Curated annotation (Swiss-Prot):
The lineage of its organism: Eukaryota, Fungi, Dikarya, Basidiomycota, Ustilaginomycotina. Residues 291-307, 375-388 have a biased composition (Basic residues). It comes from Mycosarcoma maydis. This is Mating-type locus allele B1 protein. GO terms for molecular function: DNA binding. Residues 107-184 bind DNA.
């Protein structure tokens, strides 16, 4: 460093006073000139300044002058930072006011955010607060009101969509952070630290020449995207890391802008809507399960085997060997078909004497003839032989019991 041999503390104080007056008088246009003068003054200071003659009063004035220059410089730096922060707040506030009046701002318009989506206002708020997409309670209530008003105005209420509520909006933001990839970037490139994520998003927006959300504190960290990524990863940034971050960022922005509906096309939703049948009022909505997709083949239930035990029908028709007492009538399967034999058989019994009737007196004529003539010119059909009851007096006398014929009127 070259030094001036004629340098003294008095000349040094005079140079500082001149720089101080110019610094206070200038409006910012000559700041580079002042910086150049300070560098030249630094070069004139000899290395052996400690060996110069010391004047306590001059040294005190030099300290006071340098302190004033430092204070003014720091004040100007803070003013500049505050000015930038206020500009960002004005832009953000203007965008919020325009959002409430449903006016698309130029910044959002250039992002091609789809206004046809039901979650338009929520996605729009997500884009404006990428560094911290956690809306406050007041912002949630505003978004719910705007979404319900826009849905009713556009005519989407025709699909019987219920009004949005605050807890549903909270769940939407939770799912949006996860499904868009914001949480993935937070975990992979920001160490799951929301303050690091906020700085990373600001650096990315600055590198893309986009407006950054206002910051409540002065950010003294670097805004270089590569430096921020390298610091968050804890190692030097590689081209692969940079490409992965760019891909994840592009995927996140695409999901926030367009969602899923516009990617697959409206014809898919039209086809699904046409295939659905309108349920009857009052009927529960059918739920498709694995068992219902492939129903089992319907089979007829196994028929119960019929009982072979015949139920005997009580018949009031008396047999030929019974008495005329109706309380001792015999019920047989062969006589179940003779429903009109009561009157006819009583007439037949009155004309024939049971004690004198011998079915074998005419030989085999009665057996060979299928019918016999009864009283009143009615024909009766002979039924197969059946063993009759033996009379007690006949058994005692040694007589052979005779067979009775059951008859049925044709």
């Amino acid at each position: 460093m070259s030094s001036d041999p004629n340098f003294s503390l008095i000349s040094f104080l005079e140079c500082l006073n001149e720089i101080e007056h110019e610094f206070l008088r200038d409006k910012g246009e000559n700041y580079p000139v002042l910086v150049r003068k300070l560098r030249e003054l630094q070069q004139k200071i000899p290395n052996d300044i400690a060996n110069l003659p010391r004047d306590p009063e001059t040294i005190q004035q030099i300290h006071q002058t340098t302190h004033r220059i430092r204070a003014v410089a720091q004040a100007f730096i803070r003013f500049d930072q505050k000015f930038v922060s206020l500009c960002s707040e004005v832009v953000h506030g203007t965008s919020k006011v325009m959002q409430e009046f449903n006016v698309v701002s130029p910044d959002v318009g250039c992002r091609n955010l789809s206004e046809d989506l039901p979650a338009y206002h929520m996605r729009k708020h997500f884009l404006l607060t990428l560094d911290n997409p956690y809306p406050t309670q007041e912002e949630k209530e505003t978004l719910v009101r705007l979404t319900n008003e826009s849905t009713a105005r556009v005519g989407q209420s025709s699909v019987n969509r219920p009004p949005l509520e605050v807890h549903q909006l909270t769940l939407w933001f939770i799912n949006a952070r996860r499904r868009s990839g914001w949480s993935h970037i937070l975990k992979k490139f920001a160490r799951e630290d929301r303050s690091r994520m906020k700085h990373l998003v600001r650096a990315k927006l600055s590198s893309s020449n986009q407006s950054t959300p206002p910051s409540s504190t002065s950010d003294s960290l670097s805004n270089n995207l590569d430096d921020v990524l390298s610091d968050n990863l804890g190692r030097p940034l590689t081209p692969v890391d940079k490409q992965q971050f760019e891909d994840d960022w592009a995927s996140m922005i695409s999901w926030i802008k367009y969602g899923v509906k516009e990617k697959v096309g409206d014809w898919v939703y039209d086809l699904c809507a046409a295939s659905k049948k309108t349920p009857k009022p009052g009927m529960p909505r059918p739920v498709t399960t694995v068992a219902k997709r492939h129903p089992a083949r319907k089979t007829k239930p196994a028929a119960k085997p019929k009982s072979r035990t015949a139920n005997p029908r009580a018949s009031t028709t008396p047999s030929i060997d019974s008495t005329l007492d109706s309380s001792k009538l015999e019920s047989t399967p062969e006589l179940s078909m003779c429903s009109t034999a009561d009157t006819s058989f009583s007439t037949f019994g009155s004309s024939l004497s049971m004690s004198h009737y011998n079915p074998f007196q005419d030989g085999n004529d009665i057996l060979q003839s299928p019918t016999v003539k009864a009283r009143g010119n009615r024909k009766v059909k002979a039924l197969p032989k059946r063993a009759g009851k033996q009379q007690p007096d006949e058994v005692d006398n040694g007589k052979i019991p005779f067979l009775c014929l059951s008859v049925a009127f044709v």
